[in-house]
């Protein structure tokens, strides 16, 4: 459960959030949408411990994330991130990228199993820089599966992809969500928003 209470955030003279409140239940698929500059990514970053609010609280499973001394543990294990730029080690193979995560988090799933889940097992020995953008984002999704975070924060993950690859990524995100994970997605692309999603217009 994520509870946001009386959240305030401003940049210079621009108020992005004023006494903003929101509750997100475990296992929801939530979409933040709205015009450019409305605060979608800022809100996601505040939930993800990447950007501090001016005041107010963000509570995840009973822990106020901006007051706890266990922020690093929360960041490392509870939250998983999916960005537009993939954040992979391009000079390493697909399998090497996943083994780094598997070793760190001691996942119950093997890297090969994660690759099979995203349909990329045959690329395991390929250097990441040789993959298409859509394939790289699927590797990033396989990495999330290995991390097994309860909350997935996805910031414009289809922003640089064509429609076909965007649809594949969204299908995989919904698959992760249906396994019991909470997914919070930021997008400006109405086309990828599913009827199954809870849409928050900012």
Predicted regions and their residues:
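Helix-to-loop junction immediately C-terminal to a conserved catalytic motif
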Residues: 48
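Conserved ABC ATPase signature
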Residues: 127-131, 135-137
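ABC ATPase NBD Q-loop/coupling interface
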Residues: 57-73
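Conserved ABC ATPase "signature" region
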Residues: 108-123
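Catalytic Walker B motif of ABC-type/P-loop ATPase nucleotide-binding domains
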Residues: 152-155
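Conserved structural motif at the start of ABC-family nucleotide-binding domains
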Residues: 2, 17-19
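Hydrophobic anchor residue at the start of the ABC signature
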Residues: 141
């Amino acid at each position: 459960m994520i509870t946001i209470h009386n959240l305030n955030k401003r940049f210079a003279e621009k108020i992005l959030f004023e006494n903003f409140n929101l509750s997100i239940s475990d296992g929801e698929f939530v979409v933040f949408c709205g015009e450019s500059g409305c605060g979608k990514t800022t809100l996601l970053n505040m939930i993800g411990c990447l950007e501090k609010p001016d005041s107010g609280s963000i509570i995840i499973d009973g822990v106020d994330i901006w007051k706890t001394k266990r922020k690093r543990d929360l960041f490392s294990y509870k939250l998983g991130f999916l960005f537009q730029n993939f954040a992979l080690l391009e000079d390493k193979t697909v399998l090497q990228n996943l083994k780094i995560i598997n070793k760190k988090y001691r996942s119950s799933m093997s890297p090969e199993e994660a690759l099979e889940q995203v349909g990329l097992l045959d690329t395991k020995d390929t250097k990441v820089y040789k993959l298409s953008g859509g394939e790289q984002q699927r590797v990033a999704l396989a990495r999330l599966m290995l991390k097994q975070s309860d909350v997935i924060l996805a910031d414009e993950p289809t922003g640089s992809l064509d429609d076909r690859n965007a649809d594949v990524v969204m299908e995989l995100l919904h698959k992760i969500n249906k396994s019991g994970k909470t997914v919070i997605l930021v997008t400006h692309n109405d086309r990828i928003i599913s009827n199954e999603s809870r849409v928050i217009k900012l």
